[in-house]
Curated annotation (Swiss-Prot):
GO molecular function: corticosterone 18-monooxygenase activity; heme binding; iron ion binding; steroid 11-beta-monooxygenase activity
Positions bound to heme: 447
Transit peptide extent on chain: 1-24
Cofactor: heme
Source species of the chain: Mesocricetus auratus
Name listed for the protein in its UniProt record: Cytochrome P450 11B2, mitochondrial
UniProt xrefs under InterPro entries: CYP11_CYP27_families, Cyt_P450, Cyt_P450_CS, Cyt_P450_mitochondrial, Cyt_P450_sf
Annotated Gene Ontology cellular component terms: mitochondrial inner membrane
Keywords per UniProt: Heme, Iron, Membrane, Metal-binding, Mitochondrion, Mitochondrion inner membrane, Monooxygenase, Oxidoreductase, Steroidogenesis, Transit peptide
Metabolic or biological pathway: Steroid biosynthesis
Gene responsible for this protein: CYP11B2
Length: 500
């Protein structure tokens, strides 16, 4: 099923039809042999005052990905602009991602996420790896990797995720069979949100929250609301100076801080419980990432708490939205869905015996996730502050420049992905390029929760699709909006019908 971006008609036009447009992906071959200076990079002029007004009116920058996509079409695969005193260079080709990776230092630097940092500073809390730079970042990251990202760690926590995914399936079956029509039509987004929290919390703290049932406790509802609030308020605060928003966005700052306070206190309670149970006797079986970190003394307690806060907040929306869009695209592409179902049914015995086999025995389903994230990259863009000079598209880019790599535009570039408007998971079964699937970043600073997110999505889809056909009447594309992560502006209605 072809995607047609109704919100912006220009997305459907040929790439060379606009004035000043260059053939993306071929510009490097057409560039002169002599190195060109930074000042020669095409400059993009943003209407700063209009953007500021939109943000102050709490519209945020919901169309940021589309604005940048249009800029690439007009200016080519590289352009620059100023963000306050910061020089920003935007790129969107795999070759530039590879160059960024090649010059990475031992301490790859990111921008400070001002609203999140402000909360930690005001509350006297440590920062985790998402907010750290420099040697402190490396110290934390090297001690977290073996417990969160390594194959050995994945082998330990996969059975926990599988248990939650199976419980989600049983909950869905119960809802379907209670319906007189023998099927269920629903907005599945909140259910998937609850699944992501349940699975992540179980893996982190070894504790189930009971979010897959009908009656949630007031404490659970407060916690869920806080997670939503953090991502809602972040883009309203991150694009303006704190000195301005402290006066113009007082209510938003208050909501942002209160949401983080709820999450922080929740994590503190979980850590206190894990600590007490470890003091009373070490568990005989694996009981989650935090218990492993504490029992092995891998990090100071403050660092464990700081990284647990970030993992708790960051492991929910980033899993939920790709799951929503994967189910939606499979519903719009029943032939692809049937092929995935056949694969899951064929692998059912091996995955049931060892859930980790899902990572190797379901190649088409893994391709579905890659194709979904090509079209709907949850992060939108990757960022690096250059530690040394670099040449991008034959332009000199000096050290200290902020470089943004836009995944949304890369995924829709026909020079990188032929027929980008088509949902074709099978393209990933034949591709070899390692810098084309970058949703989880690259290099030593790739997403810490990458493996956990992949396992959560893979097992959930495996269990649901082998038991249910997913259908929809909606044929129009879902409009995506930038809310710190790329999210659907509205969740499509999906019908779950038991496989006969």
């Amino acid at each position: 099923m072809a995607l047609r971006a109704k919100a912006d008609v220009w997305l459907a036009r040929p790439w060379q039809c606009l004035p000043r447009t260059r053939a993306l992906g071929t510009t490097a071959a057409l560039a002169p042999n002599t190195l060109r200076p930074f000042e020669a990079i095409p400059q993009y002029s943003r209407n700063r005052w209009l953007k500021m007004l939109q943000i102050l009116r709490e519209e945020g920058q919901e169309g940021l990905h589309l604005e940048m996509h249009e800029a690439f079409r007009e200016l080519g695969p590289i352009f620059r602009y100023s963000m306050g005193r910061t020089q920003v260079v935007s790129v969107m080709l795999p070759e530039d991602a590879e160059k960024l990776h090649q010059v990475e230092s031992m301490h790859p630097r990111r921008m400070h996420l001002e609203p999140w940092v402000a909360h930690r500073e005001h509350r006297g809390l440590s920062r985790g790896v998402f907010l750290l730079n420099g040697p402190e970042w490396r110290f934390n990251r090297l001690r977290l990797n073996p417990h969160v990202l390594s194959p050995k760690a994945v082998q330990k926590f996969v059975p926990m995720v599988d248990m939650v995914a199976r419980d989600f399936l049983e909950s869905l079956k119960k809802k379907v069979f209670q319906n007189a029509r023998g099927s269920l039509t629903m907005d599945v987004q909140q259910s998937l949100f609850n699944y992501s929290i349940e699975a992540s919390n179980f893996v982190l703290f070894g504790e189930r929250l009971g979010l897959l049932g009908h009656d949630l406790s007031p404490a659970s509802l407060t916690f869920i609301h806080a997670l939503h609030s953090v991502f809602k308020t972040t883009p309203q605060l991150m694009f303006l100076p704190r000195s301005l928003t402290r006066w113009t966005s007082t209510r938003v700052w208050k909501e942002h801080f209160e949401a983080w306070d709820v999450i922080s206190e929740y994590v503190n309670r979980c850590i206190r419980k894990v600590h007490q149970e470890l003091r009373l006797g070490s568990p005989h079986t694996y009981s989650g990432i935090v218990a492993e970190l504490m029992s092995q003394g891998a990090l100071p307690l403050d660092a464990i708490r700081a990284n647990s806060i970030e993992l708790t907040a960051g492991s929910v929306d980033t899993t939920t939205f790709p799951l929503v869009m994967a189910l939606f695209e499979l519903a719009r592409n029943p032939d692809v869905q049937q092929a995935v179902r056949q694969e899951s049914l064929a692998a059912e015995a091996s995955v049931a015996a060892n859930p980790q086999r899902a990572m190797s025995d379901l190649p088409l389903l893994r391709a579905v996730l890659k194709e979904t994230l090509r079209l709907y990259p949850v992060g939108g863009f990757l960022e690096r502050i250059l530690s040394s000079d670099l040449v991008l598209q034959n332009y000199h880019v000096p050290a200290g420049t902020l470089v943004l790599l836009y995944l949304y535009s890369m995924g829709r570039n026909p020079a990188v992905f032929p027929r980008p408007e088509h949902y074709l998971p099978q393209r990933w079964l034949e591709r070899n390029g390692s810098f084309q699937h970058l949703t989880f970043g690259f290099g030593v600073r790739q997403c810490l929760g990458k493996r956990l997110a992949q396992v959560e999505m893979l097992l959930l889809l495996h269990h649901v699709l082998k038991s249910f056909r997913v259908e929809t009447q909606e044929r129009e594309d879902v409009r995506m909006v930038y809310r710190f992560v790329l999210a659907p502006s509205s969740s499509p209605l999906l019908t779950f019908r038991p496989v006969s």
